Swiss-Prot record:
Top-tier EC class: hydrolase
Membrane topology field: Lipid-anchor; GPI-anchor
Name of the protein in question: Multiple inositol polyphosphate phosphatase 1
One term of GO molecular function: bisphosphoglycerate 3-phosphatase activity
Entry keywords, A to Z: Cell junction, Cell membrane, Cell projection, Developmental protein, Glycoprotein, GPI-anchor, Hydrolase, Lipoprotein, Membrane, Signal
Highest classification ranks of the organism: Eukaryota, Metazoa, Ecdysozoa, Arthropoda, Hexapoda
Post-translational modification: N-glycosylated.
GO cellular component: anchoring junction; apical plasma membrane; basolateral plasma membrane; external side of plasma membrane; extracellular exosome; filopodium; plasma membrane
Expression induction or repression: Up-regulated by FGF signaling in the developing trachea.
Catalyzed reaction equations: (2R)-2,3-bisphosphoglycerate + H2O = (2R)-2-phosphoglycerate + phosphate; 1D-myo-inositol hexakisphosphate + H2O = 1D-myo-inositol 1,2,4,5,6-pentakisphosphate + phosphate; 1D-myo-inositol 1,2,4,5,6-pentakisphosphate + H2O = 1D-myo-inositol 1,2,5,6-tetrakisphosphate + phosphate; 1D-myo-inositol 1,2,5,6-tetrakisphosphate + H2O = 1D-myo-inositol 1,2,6-trisphosphate + phosphate
Length: 467
């Protein structure tokens, strides 16, 4: 008997070595789901140490908020039956064909979870990209949090002069605005957004720039393409297939379908294990994250210099509103991933010293440009303007990204002089956005630029002095 136990010990050790998502208490890979990452998992935790500026009082706030957690596009919803087919194939591999791999196999609890998985049939194609219940709570929660730290700015009584809200023409941003307003003012409130213009050049400039839309950052020769074709990436696809009991490499579309199901279901139910995340080892998720980061880096980030021009109007909007001494005191925009990423790019936030490439995956594990941390569902960029009467430069600002103070090398531990902000972004402030924002020209000029910025500020100051 003792000999039998000794012989079985190596087998037990092997079984215990198999990674088990359902038993992993840290689940660090859930922080690496790129733009499908749950906000509650990656949001900052130090705002309570960063919001209070000694000798200063918060005066104004400018917000750009990505919509909360949403449903997938119609194309993915229509593939739910394929996910069920993959489920059955995996179970057959393990229980009938007996093609379970010797190492890195699914643990029993993850296998059972996959076997019991069913698609939520209440999610239909006509609901594509709708805000989910968790997405609504994401926005309601961020409003409550910022109001807790800035009660004198984010007042609980709605006033359409004091507050200005704006969102794009989609269900997910409309509902995100409503959730945010509920977080500030309660469920029975009169908050309303400004009218959406026919051409939304402020929140969706990328829709009106043909050269931006026509750039193929995934074409042959691109860094995305090179990484996609790399041995590391294709070995990852093969290893995932083996882990699931297949004797051949699955089509990438099938693997990505399981990966997306993992990401979405984790974001929909933050406190529960997403069944399909068990299909992947943590290091495989890291590879997928880098491919996503390359996509966003070149599609909306620092990969192409022109991307920094695209959100010219939004940067001017920020500078104009925070420069004016009069209302609105709170400006909040509700938009999308591309809007947020191009805004951060225009402001030089989360910029790496070395460009992301296909060949420097290993050396950029600590990169600043991580879409999972920058651009999760419900990502938000908040600028808080302070008045510091005892200082020579009495106007200051702190930028927050997902509840974490942004560290810029020309600021002091996250606190920036407003005069430095105006100087740093002078090129954009002075620009005629109609000509500046699009690589080959865009919509006609709307009279923006330094003239418009100064004129607006001076007019506001005159009104302020007259009162």
């Amino acid at each position: 008997m003792r000999l039998l136990i000794l012989l079985l010990l190596p087998l037990v050790a092997i079984a215990q070595d198999d990674y088990c998502f359902s038993k992993d208490t840290s689940r660090l890979q859930t922080r690496q789901f790129s733009s499908k990452t749950a906000y509650q998992i990656v949001k900052g935790t130090d705002i309570d140490k960063q919001y209070l500026v000694p000798g200063c009082q918060p005066q104004k706030m400018w917000i750009f908020h990505r919509h909360g957690t949403r449903l997938p596009k119609k194309s993915m919803i229509n593939k739910a039956s394929r996910v069920a087919e993959l489920r059955d194939l995996i179970i057959n591999n393990y229980q009938v064909a007996r093609t379970k791999p010797e190492t890195d196999a699914l643990c029993q609890t993850d296998l059972i979870a996959i076997k019991l998985w069913k698609w939520n049939s209440s999610i239909t194609p006509d609901m594509e990209e709708y805000l989910t219940a968790q997405g609504y709570e994401d926005l309601r929660g961020t409003a409550k949090l910022y109001q807790r730290y800035y009660p004198t700015v984010l007042t609980a009584n709605y006033n359409d002069t004091y507050y200005q809200f704006r969102h794009t023409d989609t269900q997910r941003t409309t509902e995100s605005f409503k959730a945010f307003a509920e977080g500030l003012f309660g469920s029975q409130n009169a908050a309303h957004p400004v009218e959406i213009p026919k051409q939304d050049l402020l929140l969706r400039p990328y829709d009106y720039c043909s050269s931006f839309k026509n750039v193929n950052y995934k074409d042959e020769g691109s860094e995305y393409y090179k990484f996609h074709q790399s041995k590391l990436y294709n070995d990852t696809l093969a290893d995932i297939s083996t882990r699931l009991g297949f004797l051949y490499t699955l089509e990438e579309a099938d693997i990505k379908l399981m990966y997306d199901m993992c990401r979405y279901e984790q974001a929909w139910n933050v406190d529960r294990n997403s069944v399909w995340c068990g299909a992947f080892l943590p290091e495989q998720i890291t590879v997928f994250e880098y491919l996503e980061d390359l996509k966003y880096y070149y599609g909306s980030g620092y990969g192409f210099p022109e991307n920094a021009h695209l959100n010219c109007r939004l940067v001017q909007d920020l500078l104009t509103h925070l420069s004016n001494p009069v209302s609105p005191h709170v400006v909040a925009h509700f938009g999308h991933s591309t809007g947020l990423l191009t805004l951060l790019t225009a402001l030089g936030i989360q910029k790496d010293d070395i460009k992301l490439r296909a060949d420097n995956y290993d050396s950029l594990t600590s990169r600043r440009w991580k879409s999972s941390l920058i651009d999760p569902f419900a990502a938000n960029f908040v600028a808080v303007k302070y008045d510091c009467p005892a200082d020579l430069d009495r106007e200051k600002v702190v930028f927050f990204l997902n509840q974490q103070a942004v560290q810029l090398d020309w600021c002091s531990v996250g606190l920036c002089k407003w005069s430095d902000v105006l100087e740093k972004y002078k090129t954009i402030a002075d620009a005629d956005c109609g000509e500046y924002y699009c690589r080959t020209g865009g919509a006609p000029s709307l009279g923006s630029g330094v003239g418009g910025l100064l004129a607006t500020t001076l007019a506001a100051m005159l009104v302020y002095l007259m009162h």
